[in-house]
Amino acid sequence: QRDIILTAFDLGITHFDLANNYGPPYGSAERNFGQILRSDLAGHRDELIISTKAGWDMWPGPYGELGSRKYLLASLDQSLDRLGLDYVDIFYSHRFDHETPLEETMGALHTAVQSGRALYAGISSYNPQRTREAAAILRDLGTPLLIHQPSYSMLNRWIEREALLDVLADEGVGAIGFSPLAQGMLTDRYLAGIPADSRAAQGKSLAPQWLTDENRERLAALNALAHSR
């Protein structure tokens, strides 16, 4: 992991995107990155954009996930402790919470920025309507919504179909996609089916239903195109 991060930095990559539950175990990605930051990149902090998120399950109980003010700010404090930082550059609401008023969730992001624990506020995986509402709430609070992180790949273009990109353009909000390789499908990992040791076989982040006959045909065609170059 250290070699990957340092090689990326040496090649000009300065944005490192994390979340409280990245692991396993939860928190380990932040903790490991924090150790590498202290040992190898401490003198380069002002060159780096470091982001983290909260929204998915992190600890037991009603305040261990989703979008309550209590959870988001407690999680951010824990993330900063694991990273060994006073602030992150971007703090995201990792997913929309149907059980918490959006005003509360965006208010927590506003507090994170106003308190100096984050420089900018972001959201992830919000649909177009909720994105527009979130941007309006933050605008009224005086903390602009900087960025949205949706899933996006050649096989998953929902942000085009559902006009999320149009909403972001209207609101002046940036976009940075996650899973650009479609959770591994846009590699050669699944060309011959589902390997026994793969995430799809283990029922993790890549659902087997994504590997439809149509997508298999697309993958085979893309693989042939790649090998012809």
Where are these regions (language model features)?
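Short, acidic/polar
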Residues: 1-8, 66-84, 102-104, 131-135
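Active-site mouth loops of central-metabolism enzymes
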Residues: 57-73, 94-100
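Active-site groove signature of glycoside hydrolases
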Residues: 80-100
